[in-house]
């Protein structure tokens, strides 16, 4: 087997995560440029960035799919996962966070902490991803490094510690002061972008540099007792000790190292790459991933080349030249092309075709993938996003990823009958790639319904059908994913008995139906004593309840946040069957739910609007008209920030209305937050419309 080219401790799996316009793609591009992988720098403005390789991204100038790219810096292998910054694609971010070991969070020096940055930050916290901060666009008017520092502290409740401070800002931004080495790095505009000059710290900035270095030393000393002792006895810490302390704090997430620059003008990228290598973790420096066996036994999977193979499939893509690509992160052991692996989630054996290392949209064929590496496999038949591939000798299942339920649906139909089959194939492929996108058929109307995380999400799906699969589709009005639940506990008996010649049917259940906390889903409890309902019929009772949950009693929407306890019943030696108990439970649940004060729930979106002050009254008035509840008002860079919770049903077409109401000067972001009970008058309308 081929030996590793890069030792495990010199591998970095990192993501670049940011708000939509912080300059993330440009930063990724510059990283590829400076590490020597791409010769002409791609620019998002002219739609040519190497990372943004899907057509729609080039047009919209936003990054949709995380392309995994390998590059090298100072003998270290950096696997760069580009994550999208748009709210409708949080699933992509979530999915890439899952396989990252560290992240570079990019913030705009003017915009600072934006709503999307908070979402991405929360996801990085959830997966314990250590990160460093790069404050980008230091050359823009209004650039303020220190503002961003205080916003990260106050809004993200983190501990940002600058390891650099800027020399100048806006047009006057020249470079950075390295607080570890106490040197200035200056990029001179007439020189090549790869060159920077190391100088002494300018006299007028020396005091500020000393103040920030003192803060850095204090933060570093708290990471280690021996450093703390040195700090208190007034001894100088060496450069090595400071670096060691920054890394320890970064891995524990007690320190977030902060750097700055302007990717567009090629300033600050080399020190950023040095920080990635110096402070972000190697695969063997993070907590081992947890796994389970089929019988529920838990196990930790250490990142090592020894041991049986285990990897996580985190993304599926259709490539126009090689067909389906499955991106995997290898956690343990290694995988050779031409070998076999076992999908422990689908319980099926997979043949490993070719193995590829991706450079944005160019590919390099390799013979083996080692622990800690990320690559793409060609030719997997049954593997879905979130599945585990493992050795047949050790059938471990790595943690599953949580995928959000879609909140918006539209009906789609092809413009020509001939495209019907092509559309079905296209949608199936797209659903395989993206677990937050669902396809189903409406039983009553026979229409194909697609569901996703927001209007933009579904627009891009329809767009991709046209571009990649040449299917032109008509799209219906967006529909909201309502839910139903109950508000009071009830007890319900139901007997299902049929005697009409031959063998009868008999199932008899007593159900206790109770409401649960929001977002708890469904819970089934078997509380049968003394075998009054035999063991073998219990699963049928649960199945009957689960089936009844699919269509609520008010308007046929799925029911959630309900607990059902089977506490009594009876059976018949001859006539009882699984079918009879399933029907008894299903009908009993429906009858009970009618008495349990059923209500309709609707998805509430968290909406954040940034508007010039003169339109603030109009914006709030409009949100109130949409049944929105304003939760906070803030000020950022001279604009007003309004945060509100609004029903999704009232938010269709909001971007057009907001644009025309503010002459295009306001911007907004919207993401699903929670489900909430619908007001009575709206509920009656929904029921009337559904039940015709």
UniProtKB/Swiss-Prot annotation:
Please list which residues make up the signal peptide.
Answer: none
Question: Which SUPFAM superfamilies has this protein been placed in?
Answer: EF-G C-terminal domain-like (SSF54980), P-loop containing nucleoside triphosphate hydrolases (SSF52540), Ribosomal protein S5 domain 2-like (SSF54211), Translation proteins (SSF50447)
* SMART domains named in the record: EFG_C, EFG_IV
Q: Which PANTHER family match?
A: RIBOSOME-RELEASING FACTOR 2, MITOCHONDRIAL, TRANSLATION ELONGATION FACTOR G-RELATED
**An example Gene Ontology cellular component term from the record?**
cytoplasm
Question: In which family does this protein belong, per the annotation?
Answer: Belongs to the TRAFAC class translation factor GTPase superfamily. Classic translation factor GTPase family. EF-G/EF-2 subfamily.
Q: Which gene encodes it?
A: fusA
The residues listed in the UniProt record as binding GTP, with positions renumbered to this chain, are 18-25, 82-86, 136-139
InterPro entries from the UniProt entry? EF-G-like_DII, EFG_II, EFG_III, EFG_III/V, EFG_IV, EFG_V, EFG_V-like, G_TR_CS
Which Pfam families does UniProt cross-reference here?
EF-G_D2 (PF22042), EFG_C (PF00679), EFG_III (PF14492), EFG_IV (PF03764), GTP_EFTU (PF00009)
One Gene Ontology molecular-function label: GTPase activity
Q: Biological process GO terms, please?
A: ribosome disassembly
Function noted in UniProt: Catalyzes the GTP-dependent ribosomal translocation step during translation elongation. During this step, the ribosome changes from the pre-translocational (PRE) to the post-translocational (POST) state as the newly formed A-site-bound peptidyl-tRNA and P-site-bound deacylated tRNA move to the P and E sites, respectively. Catalyzes the coordinated movement of the two tRNA molecules, the mRNA and conformational changes in the ribosome.
Keywords assigned by UniProt, alphabetized = Cytoplasm, Elongation factor, GTP-binding, Nucleotide-binding, Protein biosynthesis
> What is the protein name for this chain?
Elongation factor G
PROSITE patterns in the record: G_TR_1 (PS00301), G_TR_2 (PS51722)
Q: Which residues form the tr-type G domain?
A: 9-284
Compartment list: Cytoplasm
Native species: Campylobacter curvus (strain 525.92)
* Protein biosynthesis listed as a keyword: yes
Can you tell which superkingdom this protein's organism belongs to? Bacteria
């Amino acid at each position: 087997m081929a030996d590793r080219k890069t030792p495990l401790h010199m591998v970095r799996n990192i993501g670049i995560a940011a708000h939509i316009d912080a300059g993330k793609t440009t930063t990724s591009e510059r990283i590829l440029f400076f590490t020597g992988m791409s010769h002409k720098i791609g620019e998002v403005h002219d739609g040519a960035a190497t990372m943004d390789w899907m057509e729609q991204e080039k047009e919209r100038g936003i990054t949709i799919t995380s392309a995994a790219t390998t590059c090298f810096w100072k003998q270290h292998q950096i696997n760069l996962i580009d994550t999208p910054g748009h709210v409708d694609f949080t699933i992509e971010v979530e999915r890439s966070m899952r396989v990252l070991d560290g992240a570079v969070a990019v913030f705009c020096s003017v915009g600072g902490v934006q709503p999307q940055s908070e979402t991405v930050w929360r996801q990085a916290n959830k997966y314990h991803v250590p990160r460093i901060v790069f404050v980008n666009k230091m050359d823009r008017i209004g650039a303020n490094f220190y503002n961003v520092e205080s916003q990260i502290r106050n809004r993200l409740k983190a501990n940002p510690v600058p390891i650099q401070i800027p020399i100048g800002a806006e047009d006057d931004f020249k470079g950075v002061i390295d607080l570890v080495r106490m040197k200035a790095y200056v990029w001179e505009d007439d020189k090549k972008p790869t060159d920077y000059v190391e100088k002494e710290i300018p006299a007028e900035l020396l005091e500020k540099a000393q103040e920030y270095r003192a803060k850095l030393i204090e933060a570093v000393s708290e990471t280690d007792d021996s450093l703390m002792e040195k700090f208190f006895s007034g001894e100088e810490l060496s450069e090595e000790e400071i670096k060691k302390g920054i890394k320890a704090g970064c891995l524990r997430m007690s320190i977030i190292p902060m750097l700055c620059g302007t990717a567009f003008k090629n300033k600050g990228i080399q020190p950023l790459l040095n920080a990635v290598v110096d402070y972000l973790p190697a695969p063997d420096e993070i907590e081992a991933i947890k796994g389970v066996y089929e019988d529920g036994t838990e196990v930790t999977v250490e990142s090592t080349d020894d041991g049986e193979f285990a990897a996580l499939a985190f993304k599926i893509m259709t490539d126009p030249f090689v067909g389906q690509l499955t991106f995997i992160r290898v956690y343990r052991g290694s995988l050779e092309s031409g070998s076999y692996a076992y999908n422990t989630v689908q319980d099926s054996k997979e043949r490993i075709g070719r193995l590829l290392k991706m450079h944005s949209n160019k590919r390099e064929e390799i013979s083996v993938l080692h622990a800690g590496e990320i690559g793409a496999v060609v030719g997997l038949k049954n593997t879905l996003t979130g599945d585990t591939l493992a050795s047949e000798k050790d059938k471990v299942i790595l943690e599953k990823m949580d995928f959000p339920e879609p909140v918006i649906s539209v009906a789609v139909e092809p413009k020509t009958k001939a495209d019907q089959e092509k559309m079905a194939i296209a949608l199936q492929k797209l659903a395989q790639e993206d677990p937050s996108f669902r396809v189903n058929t409406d039983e009553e109307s026979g229409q194909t319904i697609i569901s996703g995380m927001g209007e933009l999400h579904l627009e891009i799906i329809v767009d991709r059908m046209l571009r990649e699969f040449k299917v032109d589709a008509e799209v219906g009005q967006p529909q909201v994913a309502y839910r139903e639940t109950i508000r009071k506990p009830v007890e319900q008996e139901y007997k299902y008995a049929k005697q009409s010649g031959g063998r009868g049917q008999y199932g008899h259940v007593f159900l206790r139906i109770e409401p649960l906390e929001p977002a708890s889903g469904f819970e089934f409890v078997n509380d049968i004593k003394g075998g009054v309902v035999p063991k073998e019929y219990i699963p049928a009772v649960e199945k009957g309840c689960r089936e009844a949950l699919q269509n609520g009693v008010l308007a046929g929407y799925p029911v959630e946040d309900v607990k059902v306890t089977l506490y009594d019943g009876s059976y018949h030696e001859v006539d009882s069957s699984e079918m009879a108990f399933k029907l008894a439970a299903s009908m009993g649940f429906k009858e009970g739910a009618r008495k349990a004060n059923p209500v309709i729930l609707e998805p509430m979106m968290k909406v954040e609007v940034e508007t010039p002050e003169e339109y603030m009254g109009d914006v709030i008035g409009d949100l109130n008209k949409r049944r929105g509840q304003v939760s906070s008002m803030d000020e950022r860079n001279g604009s007003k920030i309004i945060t509100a919770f609004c029903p999704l049903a009232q938010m269709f077409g909001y971007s057009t209305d907001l644009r025309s109401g503010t002459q295009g000067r306001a911007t907004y972001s919207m993401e699903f937050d929670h489900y909430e009970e619908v007001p009575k008058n709206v509920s009656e309308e929904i029921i009337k419309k559904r039940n015709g």
